[in-house]
Design a protein with these regions (language model features):
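Hydrophobic helical h-region of N-terminal Sec-dependent signal peptides
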Residues: 6-14
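Positively charged n-region of N-terminal signal peptides that target proteins for export
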Residues: 1-4
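N-terminal signal peptide c-region/cleavage motif recognized by signal peptidases
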Residues: 16-18
């Protein structure tokens, strides 16, 4: 009997340990991102979508949901002020997309560069940003700008790749296909601690450029 109990308890602990992993190549907590009926304690979860949305998300778009956790912590990729960006951990800072003039150089005031040119234009209405207003596809490639978001590159349901990046196969519900594998790299272990530095930074081993080429040729 004791042996049976040990086995059962061991199995239970293993399941619990796996379930505690939100994105860590394990079981994501569904209700962290999704809501079945857009209702919680008698209140709307997503007030902007009273009838819900196609993905049963807790916010309008996948990127909105991602940023509810990752904007100010767990990577801090979207600051509140483009003039005071967050400490860099890698991707972002997407707040530069909201800047009215990116040109800080000589004559910048008369040669303005809109924030639309800051980088990856993710669709996140809650942060005041949307699809690229100029480009219809990724520079050098053919990824549709209209569908770009956090989950275009990162798998929200978890995988074993660096930063949950997609490998070879379909992305965005099959609307685009990656032909290069995810890169091999070691990232900063504590993304809520100190930011990038000469001694604390991501180490890229192989495949990063090829992976970027999935979208950029």
């Amino acid at each position: 009997m004791k042996r049976v109990l040990v086995v059962v308890l061991g199995g239970t602990l293993a399941i619990a340990s796996s379930a505690l992993a939100f994105h860590d190549a394990g079981v994501a907590h569904c209700n962290g991102c999704h809501t079945m009926h857009n209702s919680e304690d008698g209140m709307l979860v997503d007030g902007d979508s009273p009838n819900g949305n196609p993905w049963l998300l807790r916010d309008a778009t996948p990127s909105d949901v991602c940023l509810s956790c990752h904007a100010a912590r767990h990577g801090a990729v979207f600051a509140t002020d483009p003039l005071v960006p967050n400490t860099e951990y890698g991707g972002g800072d997407f707040v530069f997309l909201t800047e009215d003039n990116l040109n800080d150089g000589h004559g910048g005031a008369t040669n303005a560069i809109d924030g639309d040119a800051a980088g990856h234009n993710i669709d996140a209405p809650s942060r005041g940003v949307g699809a690229d207003g100029t480009l219809t596809s990724s520079p050098g490639g053919s990824f549709p700008a209209s569908i770009l978001g956090c989950t275009s590159c990162h798998d929200p349901h978890g995988n074993e790749n660096f930063r949950l990046l997609y490998g070879i196969g379909g992305v965005q519900d099959g609307q685009f296909t990656f032909t290069a594998a995810a890169p091999v790299a070691d990232g900063i272990a504590n993304i809520n601690g100190a930011g990038e530095s000469f001694t604390n930074h991501t180490a890229y081993h192989s495949g990063m450029s090829a992976w970027c080429g999935n979208c950029h040729g």
